Amino acid sequence: MTVLTQTTKHIESLLGQMKQIHRETFMQVDQQAFRQGMSNLGAAVNVITTDGVAGKSGFTASAVCSVTDTPPTLLVCLNRSASVFETFKQNQVLCVNTLAAHQAHLSNIFGGKTPMVDRFAHGEWRTLATQAPVLTDALVSFDCEVVQSLSVGSHDVFFCQVKAIQHCQGQNALMYFNRNYCEPHCVA
């Protein structure tokens, strides 16, 4: 057996051991530990809205991120057991309204038990390209068409192509970190 063959077999053996360690580590992460870890991943607070054949609906989410700028696309994650899930799935349009620091009350309204019909009585709303409700004084609003969805675990991931954007300058973002609302502050 050549040195190269021995080295290759040794590397393959090590890779096999690493894969096993990775599988064991993955299997040891429970839901509570994952959620605790995710609470330390600061994120913007968004009110996600829709309107269409299935009706008007909205919820609060931090599970939003950009995918690509060509074409402008972002993703939104929504639990399939959420009361608003079918409305969003059927409408296939949504608006990601990123809240400003002074709008924590809207996060609580759209994230709580407030009846859907009463949620849109708070804030000032308009529409852009898709007819999904746009919060007029949100930090930024991304008006989107859902172009693809993917089921992962308990959630669907909606891939959303941005059709229109509205910006409000001069405001600070509302963030969620360590299970609390906060504002970002520049450190450099």
From Swiss-Prot:
Q: Which SMART domains match?
A: Flavin_Reduct
| UniProt entry keywords in alphabetical sequence | Flavoprotein, FMN, NAD, Oxidoreductase
Task: Give the molecular function GO annotations.
Answer: FMN binding; FMN reductase (NADH) activity; FMN reductase [NAD(P)H] activity; riboflavin reductase (NADPH) activity
Give its E.C. classification number: 1.5.1.42
Sorted alphabetically, the Gene Ontology BP terms of this entry are: nitrogen utilization; uracil catabolic process
User: InterPro entries recorded for this chain?
Assistant: Flavin_Rdtase-like_dom (IPR002563), NADH-dep_flavin_reductase (IPR050268), RutF (IPR019917), Split_barrel_FMN-bd (IPR012349)
Catalysis: reaction(s) = FMNH2 + NAD(+) = FMN + NADH + 2 H(+)
Fetch the Gene3D superfamilies from UniProt.
Answer: Electron Transport, Fmn-binding Protein, Chain A
Q: Which Pfam families match?
A: Flavin_Reduct
Going by the record, the broad EC class of this enzyme is oxidoreductase
Question: Which family would the database say this protein is a member of?
Answer: Belongs to the non-flavoprotein flavin reductase family. RutF subfamily.
Give the protein's biological function.
Catalyzes the reduction of FMN to FMNH2 which is used to reduce pyrimidine by RutA via the Rut pathway.
HAMAP family according to UniProt: RutF
Name under which the protein is recorded: FMN reductase (NADH) RutF
Tell me the organism. Acinetobacter baylyi (strain ATCC 33305 / BD413 / ADP1)
- This chain is encoded by the gene named rutF
